[in-house]
Amino acid sequence: MIDRQLLRKNPDAIRGALDEKGVTDVNLDQILTLDQEWRERKARGDELRHERNQISSKIGKLKAAGDEDAASEAIAQSQELKNELEEIEREADKLKSELDTAMLKIPQVPDDAVPVGTDESENVERRREGFDSLRSLPDTVIPHYDLGEELEILDFERGAKVTGGGFYFAKGDGARLEHALVQFMLDIHREQGYQDVFPPIPVNSQSMVGTGQFPKFTEDAYRIGETNDEPWDNDDLWLCPTAEVPVTNMYRDEILLDDDLPVKIQAYTPNFRREAGEHGTETRGIVRVHQFNKVELVNFVRPEDSAERFDGLLTEAEVVLQRLGLPYRILEMCTGDLGFTQRKKYDIEVWAPGDDMATGPDIGGRWLEVSSVSNFGAFQSRRAGLRYRPERHESASYLHTLNGSGVAVPRVMVAIMEYYQNDDGTITIPEPLQPYMNGLSVIEGHDPVGEAAVGAGKRE
């Protein structure tokens, strides 16, 4: 949530943010009017409360002095003020509820240093890593979705049968590779000073509001027990779309001490999102699916440390790809491609050579986003009540929150399957991962499991 003082003192800055982020469904003039009317009601309520307290304090003295008529008149005045105060408070509460709801729709204001642009085509590539010494690739790199089926390590048909489109089985060495990547990532970030957390997978609506998923992205979430178009309460449950939600809300409505900071937490979770590919290869394979594994890095820092920690977080996420020997690039998001909650963001995109895309590098292949490293400033903290106290006797201030994937597992699997593919259709396992797979160095596939039974038990 944006700073309400900023809204009042510099509404043009908010208008600029709405324009830069392409937000058209926020009526800022209406919000400013609501805020003004709420403050007027609140001020009037304070006046009435003060006036009533003064009159009430006289009643006892008047009775003690034997002036019953004056005491009765004062009691009547006090009751009138009480009635008026209750009406004013009802109006103020209604206005505040409308204002709070409207404020949740205003996006974060971009950092002044963010490049201005309208959409992803104007993002800025900052650097590329790992392209100076590429390994030799087959003349034709088989896309991961075909290779995964050939090697019997990915099964899309059965995933669709069991659950639906956008779900898959990782099998045999494919499952082992996925597990190995998770443990590999957790070990790396543990070295970097991260605390491990394994959070609840269902999260309530209030948590989704706290991190900014709601109310804007309700349609992308999986709701437990109800349909998405029904009204939701704060305690309704949803499947976790990212560990950012439960981890950030761990400290919701709490005050941390300065000595606690920075807090660095990592969490592995399965993540659930309704989004799906719209065309082409996005509907095939494991690039964009409804359930995927990810290690998330969440930081809670002092405002003055926010920029430096943002750079540090980017470096920490990059280490995963560096150790795996995967080529990648760093993109800085322009204003038009910043998310709703983000003040500044970098994307880490790994190179996957199996599918040639128009937006890919000149040597072919495609870019796959495996991490978004984001600085939210105090935006999430205001929504979730995340504060810290610089000194024990000082007033509490809002924290800054940052997060980044460290990293998304399926897309790294895609990059490994395509970049470490050999001429004979096998996959070399990057050396740092081999200890996590009991020394296995090459995925050669395995005999089909239960293929003779496919269709045999199908009901007519």
Curated annotation (Swiss-Prot):
Q: Where does ATP bind?
A: 273-275, 289, 369-372
Provide the binding site for L-serine.
Answer: 242-244, 296, 405
The GO terms describing molecular function are: ATP binding; serine-tRNA ligase activity
Q: Which PROSITE patterns match?
A: AA_TRNA_LIGASE_II (PS50862)
Function according to Swiss-Prot or TrEMBL: Catalyzes the attachment of serine to tRNA(Ser). Is also able to aminoacylate tRNA(Sec) with serine, to form the misacylated tRNA L-seryl-tRNA(Sec), which will be further converted into selenocysteinyl-tRNA(Sec).
**Primary location recorded for the protein, binned into one broad class:** cytoplasm
| Family as reported in the entry's similarity comment | Belongs to the class-II aminoacyl-tRNA synthetase family. Type-1 seryl-tRNA synthetase subfamily.
The subunit structure is: Homodimer. The tRNA molecule binds across the dimer.
Report the protein name in the record.
Serine--tRNA ligase
Q: Which UniProt keywords apply?
A: Aminoacyl-tRNA synthetase, ATP-binding, Cytoplasm, Ligase, Nucleotide-binding, Protein biosynthesis
GO BP terms, alphabetized: selenocysteine biosynthetic process; seryl-tRNA aminoacylation
User: Hey, what's the signal peptide range on this chain?
Assistant: none
Segments forming a coiled coil: none
Record's catalysed reaction(s): tRNA(Ser) + L-serine + ATP = L-seryl-tRNA(Ser) + AMP + diphosphate + H(+); tRNA(Sec) + L-serine + ATP = L-seryl-tRNA(Sec) + AMP + diphosphate + H(+)
The pathway entry for this protein reads as:
Aminoacyl-tRNA biosynthesis; selenocysteinyl-tRNA(Sec) biosynthesis; L-seryl-tRNA(Sec) from L-serine and tRNA(Sec): step 1/1
- What is written about domains in the entry's comments? Consists of two distinct domains, a catalytic core and a N-terminal extension that is involved in tRNA binding.
Provide GO CC annotations from the record.
cytoplasm
Q: According to its UniProt record, where is this protein located? A: Cytoplasm
Which Pfam family is an annotated match for this chain, by its short name?
Answer: Seryl_tRNA_N
EC number per UniProt: 6.1.1.11
